[in-house]
């Protein structure tokens, strides 16, 4: 228990926040700057934009922002060679024979037929 409290205290005292982002290699990633007067620490091309945003080219990179209050925001970009959603084939939507709607309609027709046949025999 003391070890957990000690580790929690160390984590709070370090005041370092981590941000992870996945992207497609070669595209541009738009991120929000964590603090307006932060210092950029990294070797990737950094393009500041309006509204406290910045753009980076997506490569596997590690960089950080050091804020004036002492908080350090560490970013990790993970570049993928292709997006998993780009080449997925859109399958046609087809109605199966035993879908719930079909079964409900079939049950209602069966019950109606049973009552009409029963009345005809009486």
UniProtKB/Swiss-Prot annotation:
Residue ranges, Intravirion side: 118-122
Gene Ontology CC terms: host cell endoplasmic reticulum membrane; host cell endoplasmic reticulum-Golgi intermediate compartment membrane; host cell Golgi membrane; membrane; virion component
Segments on the Virion surface side according to the record's topology features: 16-96
Function: Non-structural protein which is dispensable for virus replication in cell culture.
Binding partners and assembly: Interacts with the spike glycoprotein, M protein, E protein and the accessory protein 3.
Note: Bat coronavirus 279/2005 is highly similar to SARS-CoV (SARS-like).
Protein name: Protein 7a
Organism: Bat coronavirus 279/2005 (BtCoV)
């Amino acid at each position: 228990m003391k070890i957990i409290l000690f580790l929690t205290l160390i984590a709070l005292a370090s005041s370092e926040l981590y941000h992870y982002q996945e992207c497609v290699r070669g595209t541009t990633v738009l991120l929000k700057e964590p603090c307006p007067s932060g210092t950029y620490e990294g070797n990737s091309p950094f393009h500041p934009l309006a509204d406290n945003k910045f753009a980076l080219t997506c490569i596997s990179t590690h960089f950080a922002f050091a804020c004036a209050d002492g908080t350090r925001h560490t970013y990790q970009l993970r570049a993928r060679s292709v997006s998993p959603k780009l080449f997925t084939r859109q399958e046609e939507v087809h109605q199966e024979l035993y879908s719930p709607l079909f079964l409900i309609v079939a049950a209602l027709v069966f019950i109606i037929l049973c009552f009409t046949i029963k009345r005809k025999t009486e």
